[in-house]
Amino acid sequence: MACSKMDVDKQCCICLDDEDVDRDNTIPCRHTVCRTCYVKPMLDQCPVCREPWEARKNDESAEEYTGRHYFHTYRNGGYRGVPRFESTWGLSIDEERWQNYVQHIRPLYQGFLDERIIFENPIPVNMEYPLWEDIPHTRYLWTILKSIIINAKKIVKDVTNVPPFSPEVLEQFDDFFHEEPSRDKCTFPLRSQ
């Protein structure tokens, strides 16, 4: 297919249509917009180079852009068995929806504190899983356990009287992680005495 020169002056810079373009919709920066795109909600600036477009701002036929035209939905969660919570910019989350979401998250947090941690990876992870340095997948497990301990230390600083992760138990983890894993220390001690 041979390339041909396009007449850029008569083509809409948004939808690339060249049927409904006229000189009235030309932006001061010389970009053109078709009538269909002109009346749709958009900012009062050129969609290509962001030059201000004063003529459109004063035109009553053009619909004004507001934040309600484009909602950005964010999804939190992502854990198996937990519904995703949707929030949008500019909208407040009512208390009932928030409590509904929190009731699904609370068991995950409590499971962390109760040592019932479940990871979504192909290796079945148990906190008393052997940590031998010559097995490659235990190095991956070692990294996970170290990040758990770092996060547990943060929780202990924020929350008092957490039995599974008391400061005395966490001090044992410091000594444990400063040494390399060996066959002598092949299990991860988690329960407090």
Swiss-Prot record:
Transmembrane segments: none annotated. InterPro entries: Znf_RING, Znf_RING/FYVE/PHD, Znf_RING_CS. The lineage of its organism: Viruses, Duplodnaviria, Heunggongvirae, Peploviricota, Herviviricetes. GO terms for molecular function: zinc ion binding. A zinc finger (RING-type) spans 12-50. Keywords: Metal-binding, Zinc, Zinc-finger. The keyword Metal-binding applies. This is Putative RING finger protein ORF38.
